[in-house]
């Protein structure tokens, strides 16, 4: 096995650039070879490298393995943080004793976390050295007995002895194993179903997924904060839950909280009403991972923004990870304090675009498979071609198809699909949305959908944006102010200027007229 890897590494070093070899191949290490099953296991030090090597180099490594052993070899990639050390001692533990790396489904996720908890029973959860030990990593208590909306951590024994309020487990709480894992999900508010394993990846979200995996492997180090933005139903919430679930697997006892921005606002209000800001701060400032969804809801709420600013500063200082989502680029969120915007910009900001056709097909096929249904590619392509906006719309359409098939006792076909979705397809054909126009024009001119909302003014971005505004006025019932709002909050006079400019040029420019005709036909189906 080691002889093969030396041979393989030498060949790859000659084939790749020095940077590629050092970045992707050198950190790998062979960990097991099963001659009876013809399988070779290769370890990568983190999930980001594992996924990239698997997608880019697995074919070449498999070919080299086949040539070396004169037999087909199945190359498997596994996660091992010690892979880069290339030490036999780092891989001495039998594979059967290692915890599963990628559990299947929520039940396996809970079971894996329960196993981690059992293995670490009696040991205090690890925490960054500079996190004050005044907050426990155990669980949460309520500000008042009648208030179940603000979950705060329990206090250490010496603080409880001093007369401070302590957390008491609710009815049915279990101290260990599966019950403890369930309790961790209740405290963190994570959805165990949303993992990296069932997140469908395509061009529209591959950068966001890669960044999310890197953050999950190196929380508080790689990109802090991580800011994901994009329209509704594109997978932002799925990705941040996946990060939290991965950290729960990797670090039993991690203090994690997922919260929607509206709930955070509510928590601030209740803490203010009950004069409980000390408890509020103690909780939010002591987390290992804070996941804030839809932060645009902070707009205009100055007290909430102030408290979040202090929490953000404390968490980053303690090397805790902060992850934020929004429906738009940070600088374009109205009503948010400039100092918060600057903090958002200090990390990594990644857009998630609407899914392309192939990705929409993959989403439908994956969802159908999870429902135990064999969906043909023809049906998946038919649905994907007609529904283009977001994942939620696709999943809703699939549910209608499955229900229609079940109620009528018929196999799923394109004909049945047309019947099941006739109302939805009629609406799609009759109504062209501004969002679809933006996506179609962005695809046509090879720019990002996010550029439609941005303040960027290069000609290769400004002109497609003007064309999209023109088409929005021509093909929808939206008013000029409404169109301007959908293009990053622009004034109606900006939209009017774009409409007049493109209309005038269309009458004189045959090439532009042809492009507009193609776009119109595409949008009208």
From Swiss-Prot:
Biased composition (Low complexity): 169-181
Location of the protein in the cell: Cytoplasm
Ranges where the record places region Domain IV, binds dsDNA: 406-525
DNA-binding is among the record's keywords: yes
Region described as Domain I, interacts with DnaA modulators: 1-71
Keyword Cytoplasm among record annotations: yes
GO terms of molecular function: ATP binding; ATP hydrolysis activity; DNA replication origin binding; lipid binding
Highest taxon listed in the record's lineage: Bacteria
UniProt comment concerning the protein's domains: Domain I is involved in oligomerization and binding regulators, domain II is flexibile and of varying length in different bacteria, domain III forms the AAA+ region, while domain IV binds dsDNA.
Assembly, per entry: Oligomerizes as a right-handed, spiral filament on DNA at oriC.
HAMAP family listed in its UniProt record: DnaA_bact (MF_00377)
Family: Belongs to the DnaA family.
This protein's name: Chromosomal replication initiator protein DnaA
Gene symbol of the encoding locus: dnaA
């Amino acid at each position: 096995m080691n002889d093969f890897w030396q041979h393989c590494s030498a060949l790859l070093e000659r084939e790749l650039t020095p940077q590629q070899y050092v970045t992707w191949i050198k950190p790998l290490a062979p960990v097991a070879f099963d001659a009876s099953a013809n399988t070779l296991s290769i370890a990568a030090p983190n999930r980001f490298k594992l996924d990239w090597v698997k997608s880019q180099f697995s074919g070449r490594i498999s070919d080299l393995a086949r040539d070396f052993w004169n037999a087909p070899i199945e190359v498997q990639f596994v996660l091992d943080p010690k892979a880069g050390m290339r030490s036999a001692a780092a891989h001495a533990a039998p594979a059967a004793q290692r915890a599963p790396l990628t559990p299947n489904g929520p039940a396996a996720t809970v079971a894996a976390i329960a196993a981690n908890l059992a293995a670490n029973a009696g040991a205090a959860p690890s925490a960054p050295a500079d996190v004050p030990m005044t907050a426990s990593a155990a669980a949460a208590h309520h500000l008042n007995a009648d208030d179940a909306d603000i979950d705060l951590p329990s206090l250490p024994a010496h603080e409880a002895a001093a007369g401070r309020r302590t957390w008491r487990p609710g009815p049915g709480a279990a101290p260990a194993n599966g019950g403890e894992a369930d309790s961790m999900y209740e405290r963190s508010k994570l959805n165990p179903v949303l993992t990296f394993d069932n997140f469908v990846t395509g061009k529209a979200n591959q950068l966001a997924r890669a960044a999310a995996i890197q953050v999950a492997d190196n929380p508080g180090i790689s990109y802090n904060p991580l800011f994901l933005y994009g329209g509704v139903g594109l997978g932002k919430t799925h990705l941040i839950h996946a990060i939290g679930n991965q950290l729960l697997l990797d670090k039993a006892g991690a203090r994690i909280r997922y919260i929607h921005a509206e709930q955070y606002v509510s928590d601030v209000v209740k803490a203010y009403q009950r004069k409980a800001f000390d408890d509020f701060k103690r909780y939010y400032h002591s987390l290992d991972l804070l996941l804030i969804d839809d932060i645009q809801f902070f707009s205009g709420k100055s007290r909430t923004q102030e408290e979040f600013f202090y929490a953000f500063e404390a968490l980053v200082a303690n090397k805790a990870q902060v992850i934020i989502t929004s429906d738009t680029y940070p600088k374009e969120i109205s009503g948010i304090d400039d100092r918060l915007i600057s903090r958002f910009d200090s990390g990594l900001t990644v857009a998630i675009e609407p899914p392309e056709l192939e990705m929409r097909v993959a989403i439908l096929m994956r969802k159908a498979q999870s429902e135990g249904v064999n969906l043909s590619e023809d049906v998946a392509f038919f649905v994907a071609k007609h529904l283009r906006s977001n994942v939620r719309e696709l999943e809703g359409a699939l549910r209608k198809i499955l229900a229609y098939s079940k109620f009528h006792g018929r196999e799923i076909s394109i004909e049945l699909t047309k019947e099941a979705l006739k109302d939805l397809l009629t609406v799609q054909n009759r109504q062209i949305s501004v969002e679809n126009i933006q996506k179609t024009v962005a695809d046509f001119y090879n720019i990002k959908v996010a550029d439609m909302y941005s303040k960027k003014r290069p000609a290769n971005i400004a002109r497609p944006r003007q064309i999209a505004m023109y088409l929005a006025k021509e093909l929808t019932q939206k008013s000029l102010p409404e169109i301007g709002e959908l293009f990053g909050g622009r004034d109606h006079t900006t939209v009017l200027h774009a409409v007049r400019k493109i209309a005038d040029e269309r009458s004189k420019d045959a090439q532009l007229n042809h492009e507009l005709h193609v776009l119109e036909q595409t949008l009208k189906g």
